[in-house]
Each structure stands twice: as C-alpha cells, then as structure tokens.
Amino acid sequence: MNRTAFLTLTLLLLGVISYAQDKIPAMADVPAGHFWMGSSGWGYDYDEAPVHKVNITNGFRMSISEITNAQYEEFRPEHRQLRGKDGFSYGDDEAVVHVSYDDACAYCEWLSETTGRHFRLPTEAEWEYACRAGTYTLYWIGDGLPESMQKHQRTERDMVPVSLQTCSSPANGFGLHDMHGNVEEWCIDWYGPYNAEEQTDPAGPSEGIYRVTRGGSHNTPHEFLRTANRSAAMPSDRHSQIGFRVVESNYRPDYTGQVAAAPGNVRMKKAKWASTGDKPVWTAPVPYIHTPDDGTPFYKHNHQPAVTWCDNGDLLAIWFSCDAESGREMVVLSSRLSKGSRQWSKPSLFFKVPDRNLTGSSLLHLPDGRLMHMNGVSNAGDWKNLAMSVRFSEDNGRTWCAPEFAAAEHTVRHQVIAGPIITQDGRIIQCCDAGPGSHDGSAVHISSDWGRSWIDPWDGSGQPDFKEGGNGSTIAGIHVGLVELSDGSLMTLGRGNSIVGKDGRKQMPKSISTDGGKTWTYSASGFPAIDGGQRLVLMKLQEGPLMLVSFTDHPQRTPENERGMDFTHGKGYGMFVALSYDDGMTWPVRRLMTDGVERMLDGGAWTKQFIMDSTHAEPRGYLAGTQTPDGMIHILSSRLHYQFNLAWITEVPSGL
C-alpha cells in the first residue's frame, strides 16, 4: 500500500470513528455501590414497599438527560413528523416523546451497533440508585421540588404546553439532569412487586404486562415525581409524557423478580343451564362489592360496573375503585358469583396500569366461550385522553392474555361503556363516550374479526345539533345502551343531550343508525331524562323483546312536579324496567324494580343509602347487565346485584 492510500484509509477510519462517537449522548459515571430501595408504601404508594437493600455491583454510565429529538432522529428520521404533537417537544434539544418501549430498545441497539459499545435502558434499580445519588429525601434535591424544576405539576384535562428542553434542571450528585419531571423514562424491567430480601443487581420479573417508567412528567402532580415513585405503561404505548435515557454497561441484567401467580378456585367444568321457565323469579338485591381483607387496593369510591357470565356458570363483575374519578390511583377490581352461590367473592385486583387513570370498562362473553375485556387507559390522570385496550380469557376469567391497544391514541371517543353487543352478522360493537363532558355524545367502535382490530366509523365532523329529527355522526347522549333491531339497524338510548318530547319535558334521547353506525338520526324516546350518577341498561333479551332498565327521574335535579312515573298500581319512583316488542316503537310493559318489601339498602358510590318499598326503588346508580343462558337477567347498580326473569317483568304485581 502506498503512502497516499494509507493516509486516505486512515482518514476514512478516523472519520468513521468520529462519526460514531458523535452519536453518543453526554454521559455521567455512576459508581458501583448499594442503597435502600423503595418507601414505606403508604396509601396509593403501596407498590413502593417494602424498603429493601440493593447492591449495584457494576458501575455504569448514564446519559445526563433524556434522549433528545435530534439524537433519536439520527436513528429514525421519520420521527420528526411527531415533533409538536399535542403541543410538546418541538426543538432539537427537547426530550423525545411518542416512543414506545420497543422504540427505546431499538435505539439502544442501533447506538450499540453504530458505536461498537454497549447501550441499553437502565434497570429500575439502576434508575433509582442513580436518581438518589446517595440521598434519601423525597427528591434528590430535598423533600420539596423547587419552582424552577417544575413543569406544570398538576393534572389537567387539557395539558398545558411546556418546554421539554433537556438539562434544564440542576444536576444531582452523579451529574444527572431532569431526574424529576420533564418526561417519564422507560426502564428495562417488567413491572412487579418488591420483596424484602436483599438483592444484587435486580432486573424485575421474567415476564409481565407493563414496563416500568420512572421520574414523572410534566402536567403531573408532584408526588408522582418522587425518587421512589413507580409508574408503568403498556410496552406499545406512545404519548407526550414518556421518553427515555440510556445506560452504557457491559453488564446484561438477568431477571430476578417475582412472577405473579394466577388466581385459583375458578372451576373449569362447563355449566348446565336449566331454564327458569314461565314462573316469575325475583331475588332481593345483594351487594357484589365487599371490603377486601388481603391487602387488595380498595378506595372509597367504587363505581361504573361491567358484568358477564362465564361458561362455568359464574358471574364476573368488574368496576373501578378510586378516591377521585380523575385519579391515577384508580384500579379495576373484580368479584365473582360462583354458580349456585348467593355470596359474591371478596374483590381482587383485575386490571391496573400503574399510575394511569382507567376510566371505562366492559366485559363480553363470546360465542366460542372466551371472555373479552375492554378498558380505557389514560396517559396520566383524568378520563379525557384515553386509549382503548382489549384482552381475552380462555379459562372463565381466571387468566388473561396481555392487553393490546384496540385504539392506541390517547384522545376522545375512547371512554369504554359497559354493554357491547354482537350483531347478527358477527360484528362486535363497543360504545364509548365521545368526550369527558355530560353532553359530548357517544361513539361506536366496531370489530369484524372478533376483537383483533377495530374501527370508528365517525367522519370526523363536529358535534351535531341533537334535536328531534336531526342527524349526525355522533350518538346523542353519553353512557348509552345499544341494541340491534330486527332489520339490522342500530338503536341507542343515552344520558344527556336530552330532547324535549311532546309533553314539553326533557326526554332521554334515542339515536337510530341504518348504515352500521356511520350516521344517526335523533328523536325523543318517551322516557324521562336521567342525569348525574345514573346510567341505563338497554338489552335485547334471548326471548326477543328489548329491555330497558333506567330511572323515573333524578332525585335531586329533576323538578319535583316531573318526578316519578305511572305504573299499574300508581306512581312510582326510582329504577324501573320496560319491555318493547316492536323494536322500541312502543313500551307497553313497565315495572318498578321492587318486590314491595320495605328495606334499607346501601347503593354505594353516588347513591348511598335509600329505602326500597312498594313505591320506591333504587334512585340512581350506574347500571350494567347480562342475561345468562337459563334466562335469568342480572342487573348491577353501583353496588347491588338484582336478578329476575322475563316472567317477573311481565307479571302483574299484586299489592304494589
């Protein structure tokens, strides 16, 4: 090789090396050591306990801030199209967002291949060790977060845009910036429980559902930015509050955590159903929500149920539990009524994406015996910006596959409502509130492949004028019930967007679609409007008629002279059931939901205590319903379980 060629090759190699090194983010050294991980785990923070000793035997280098737009776009230039989405992260040096766990791992692999060095995401233990930098205060900087380090630290329905400029906060003792806030950061671990034993280089369980995120974000209350706080997300989630930083280390983490055990005591034998026949059957309401005694997270507000039946004869009920409906402490709990039992089980944890609001749940029994669960998943708190998740069970709800997104964008039209249906041609139709307000209307999401993919047939137009004879692409009312009529058209009844009827009073709106949910025509339903703390059930019974369960009025908001409805033996108040034999044109059968026995009941949630007697039924509650193969109809309110059959509805009540 001549001198010129040698020099040329040398310069080329130096250029390649220089190019590769330029890709490496600014890094800080984090030495080996040990620390005490977690917190006392009081209240919402139960998953931070127990405090346990962790040894970090391998020092590592960590990027001094989150990976920026400019750095990430060296790997994926097309990501530039997402700059500024939702009002965040416009600049080169702002933290990259709208990246999934897999996106973050792919960047680490690319950076490793490009530089010939070893990059990955931090383990959860490495992240907390690096954040603490030898401290044990709530934040590395102390027990409070200075104003200069805050980026609108509160929950907002409409997030307030802030800069995500990296290195905008002081560095901790290891030289790391932005460890509290800016954006959450993906960690390599599956989310799982802590244990009290001393651990060395832990890396979480070998399998799981959610990946850990740490550090908190903008538009997030202070407590979620604490050093010990644990959050997590579905690995495929992407939104404006999660980014990542990288670690350089030759150490490859090995799984060390616990894998959650599947619940037991669920029978697998298929039940035999005997018809209840023509004899009226009514069972006095019993609670399906009890206080757990095994440490299951349980809060003061238990609400918004869904229910279905299982092939083994059990009923499965779910609902959310929280202190605030906009809260990030929200969990979805379940209880089970085993076939032949009158006592519902104590609640157990059914669904929880840590530190995410989970408003909106539904359950559905599929023809092949599987169960389908759909749920809203917020990017943070509140119930406006929800994605929709879906998962399935093949063993009567004992275990469930990992959830996937039915609709991945965190936006409106995704607040799942109980009561999905299966149409005559095999489509699943799931109703959702179209917005967070009481008069935002409703949407439908449709699957033609048994839940694997979903579409919203909405044309993108604004909210229509919900008036008699009007039409639009959004359903009138929220919390709607949906049925398919005999000609294949769809009908809903809902709450809010009331339409004045011929009697001059506000009535529950009815919406009809003859084109598979693309457009809807509105009219007054003939039934009283309902309001806060109330949700109806609309079902097509196995025997053929349509069934509505709703309320005669709102006990606080309906004008007194408009309260109550006329029934066979006079005026009644509260929950009632009605039947239609002509696709909702007329409703000749109406019965107050009571057996006439006076009793004091606790309806939970917004209902609280009420008297049931011959003229009064439950005054309000969020209803959900299912009909089992034996013909029994099961209605859940916010706390109580009612069961009866068609013969009871049509029976002429005596003494009422």
Residue ranges and their predicted role:
Residues 201-205, 231-238, 565-567, 613-614, ...:
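Short proline/glycine-enriched turn/loop segments at secondary-structure junctions
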Residues 1-4:
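Positively charged n-region of N-terminal signal peptides that target proteins for export
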